[in-house]
Amino acid sequence: MKILRKNHPLLKIINHSFIDLPTPSNISSWWNFGSLLGMCLMIQILTGLFLAMHYTSDTTTAFSSVAHICRDVNYGWLIRYLHANGASMFFICLFIHVGRGIYYGSYVLSETWNIGIILFLTTMATAFVGYVLPWGQMSFWGATVITNLLSAIPYIGSTLVEWIWGGFSVDKATLTRFFAFHFILPFIITAFVLVHLLFLHETGSNNPSGLNSNSDKIPFHPYYTIKDLLGILFLLTALMILALFFPDILGDPDNYTPANPLNTPAHIKPEWYFLFAYAILRSIPNKLGGVLALLLSILILMAFPLLNTSKQHGLIFRPITQTIYWILIANLLVLTWIGGQPVEYPFTMIGQIASITYFAIILILXPVSNTIENNIIKL
């Protein structure tokens, strides 16, 4: 078997990626989230496939088809809630994965990092179109509000929105194409994941010390496969607790009301994992400015390799930047909270302060702290 896995054209690719892969001996549990994201993607594709077998992408039957899945299909309720809460677990792992990349300076592997950001954006797009499919109140109004943002683009905005809608409002054509997008995007994500891994295995993994680990590497299997299995066990336990005991805790009660274009919900808001970006969008009074800020809130991650001027790799020995990093995390939590609040004083003001702080930390404070720490090293 040893010879076969090293020489077989297909098996040797798997061997070099998951078995004999030289891995730093000191990577911590923060490195588990890559494999957990792979697990989440597999769960989402499988549960999604079974849901698609019973779902109908028609405005008159979409809502009742989801109810039919929960009531009449064997374990349909479980598949539906695993899929809905699986998306939340996916984003929790995604945020931690990106946060670890920032903390330990993984963004210096720029190709891997940039493909990762494209993956992040594609996952957000997939989650957005997926949220529209149950055709509840929040699905319909969320789709209307977010797609309407494109009308802020000068000259072509209105035409673009109508083109995406497939008519003059969010209707049957919109739902059908959103279902098509939601079905195809996970497979595009899978392709990007392979490219992400390809670039990662070209350079090798980063490690907590930030030092070159070529002199101290161990095979991925069995050391990290067993570690990943433990992580997967924790993830599945958390997902099952969510799906079985608190299936609706992260959802919106408005989505249990069928979509009605004549009745607007009191507070239109996306799923919890988009709230930070939604808060940044709402904090700017100008429509086009808000859309640009929304885009930049994610695309600014691409600037990390360019903004990094530190002589040290990662934040493990950099207390000033560490403090700024944790302020950034706290700031993102504040933005997430604000995104779910109504548009009124004092929430609007807190949102504006938190949005300015978010961009200031990344564009000003972090590069300044890098320079200060570089000068301290010289002392």
Curated annotation (Swiss-Prot):
Location(s) in or outside the cell: Mitochondrion inner membrane
Coiled-coil intervals: none
Statement: the UniProt record of this protein carries the keyword Transmembrane: yes
Gene Ontology molecular function: metal ion binding; ubiquinol-cytochrome-c reductase activity
Sites where the protein binds heme b b566: 97, 196
Residues the entry annotates as binding a ubiquinone: 201
Key words of the record: Electron transport, Heme, Iron, Membrane, Metal-binding, Mitochondrion, Mitochondrion inner membrane, Respiratory chain, Transmembrane, Transmembrane helix, Transport, Ubiquinone
PANTHER family reported in the protein's UniProt record: CYTOCHROME B
Role of this protein: Component of the ubiquinol-cytochrome c reductase complex (complex III or cytochrome b-c1 complex) that is part of the mitochondrial respiratory chain. The b-c1 complex mediates electron transfer from ubiquinol to cytochrome c. Contributes to the generation of a proton gradient across the mitochondrial membrane that is then used for ATP synthesis.
Name of the featured protein: Cytochrome b
Organism of this sequence: Akodon toba (Chaco grass mouse)
